[in-house]
């Protein structure tokens, strides 16, 4: 969730792992993706889909994916649509209402980039699971989901609603819904979009202060990760930063943990890594966060 993507420590590819650049197709949009697999792939091995956060890319996840592959899994990272190497969205903007449009008039097509639409991110994550499910060597009964920051909420929402996902690991995850003035603004955007009095192409998408890209607020009103937790039943581990500066961890994974641990039979774990901030999870917190995720998938996939 950054204005610019931090420069992360470089990936040192293990000798036992190979990486292949692939394309995932999601609603006709090409998603830039990388597949990590052990060089000696067993006949049937677990697979993990990884989701980056706001302003990130597939490279945010590369060290985690390589580590999963080194542990014997097949891992898939991808960049969300409209960001970096993935394809744009095409938005059509007509000059007239449909009923009044001249027969010879074609609507204008606009390429849209760097937009956060949570439901589009969910669809792209599902497409990534579809892709991984068809990868030779992947055991379809042992697919895991991993997500970081805003992508952690996407992974959690997906795990609650996709029966193919059997284990979940998230870190510094943003999972709370919009509230207060932001929710009121999003509701108004949805109303105005439906009534044709607001056009994000002509009027501009909203910007979240301090964050890269743009926000399609009209699409946020029904995005509720915590509201999905009654359907989440897979083993779930959540990691937070002790000095998180972007949001209150008590309102996000802290709240998710309280909900999950109250569910009979739910396997869940919550850990706060001390002395790191949000982006510290990729630096001083990397050794701990990555090992917890690897161990979780080993135990539950």
Predicted regions and their residues:
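N-terminal cap/lid segment of alpha/beta-hydrolase-fold proteins
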Residues: 2-43
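The serine-hydrolase catalytic nucleophile loop
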Residues: 54-67, 80, 250-252
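Conserved alpha/beta-hydrolase
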Residues: 65-90, 94-105
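Alpha/beta-hydrolase active-site loop
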Residues: 96-136
